[in-house]
A protein has these predicted regions:
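Sec/Tat signal peptide C-region and signal peptidase I cleavage site
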Residues: 24-30
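N-terminal secretory signal peptides that target proteins for export/translocation
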Residues: 1-7
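Exported/periplasmic ABC-transporter solute-binding proteins
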Residues: 30-78, 85-88, 92-270
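Bacterial N-terminal signal peptides
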Residues: 10-23
């Protein structure tokens, strides 16, 4: 009897030891968070994501494109955890379809709209009512813009040109791009003499210079909302909280973004 008890205790001890070693030897799997973000956020959000990954050990995968294209992909079932739009319209679009976590939605960033030229260009313009934009393009030059009917930067740009009374003159000279970074590239490569992008895009590209900034009252306020998607993994909340916290703010400010309602942002959890 005593022998059996000793043997049973020994086997239990062996089992518990194996279980403990097995558990200890299994690495904790890092969470992977998927973000769909407006193309204009690339430099700033990449920097914020790197800082978060270094701190958390999690992996952040970011897909950059036009807000319109990303919203349509999410509507079509593309797997993502967070949507970061360059305007309110496309966030509203997903909200109306019950595809975002409404309680998480925050309008986080602001931006400016600028007219750019290649770095070596000598063009000089004052952006005002009736300014000679079409003349500045020359006989066959194009104006680079993101898609004026769908992409936020293009919509802001078209609205500004209409307000300033020059859209009709320049409409046929617009070279439309799939997103604002593609429009930026047209100008950086010298393919177009002028383009309309965000101030942050111009700051990120050394091959262009700012000719002028569009008046704030010439277009809707440029605002960037961010939200968790309704289907987001629970692990995505940590990165979301980091992005909207003061801890991440310097990454956005360094690229020229304005932090909206800065004082109300929560501090990221340690």
């Amino acid at each position: 009897m005593a022998t059996r008890l000793i043997r049973r205790s020994f086997l239990q001890l062996v089992f518990l030891t194996i279980l403990a070693v097995s558990s200890f030897g299994t690495p904790v799997r890092a969470a992977e968070v998927t973000v769909f973000a407006a193309a204009s956020l690339k430099n700033a959000l990449d920097d914020a994501a790197k800082a978060y990954e270094a701190k958390s050990g999690d992996k952040v995968v970011i897909s950059y494109a036009a807000s319109s294209a990303l919203a349509k992909q999410i509507e079509g079932g593309a797997p993502a955890d967070i949507f970061f739009s360059a305007d309110l319209d496309w966030m509203d679009y997903l909200q109306q379809k019950n595809l975002i976590d409404v309680g998480s939605r925050k309008t986080l960033l602001g931006n400016t709209l600028v007219l750019i030229a290649p770095k070596g260009s000598t063009v000089s313009l004052t952006i005002e009512k009736g300014f000679p934009l079409v003349q500045a393009l020359g006989s066959d030059g194009k104006l680079a813009m993101a898609d004026v009917n769908a992409v936020p930067a293009g919509k802001y740009g078209k609205a500004a040109l209409i307000y300033l009374g020059v859209w009709d003159a320049v409409a046929s000279r617009v070279a439309q791009a799939e997103n604002v970074r593609a429009a930026l590239a047209f100008v950086a490569r010298g393919e177009t003499p002028l383009g309309i992008v965000y101030g942050t895009d111009a700051k990120a590209e050394p091959a262009v210079r700012v000719v002028g900034t569009f008046p704030e009252d010439s277009h809707l306020k440029i605002e960037y909302p961010v939200a968790l998607l309704a289907s987001a993994k629970p692990e995505a909340r940590k990165f979301f909280d980091f992005v909207v916290s003061p801890t991440a703010a310097p990454a956005f400010e360094a690229q020229g973004f304005t932090i909206l309602s800065k004082s109300s942002l929560p501090q990221a959890a340690e």
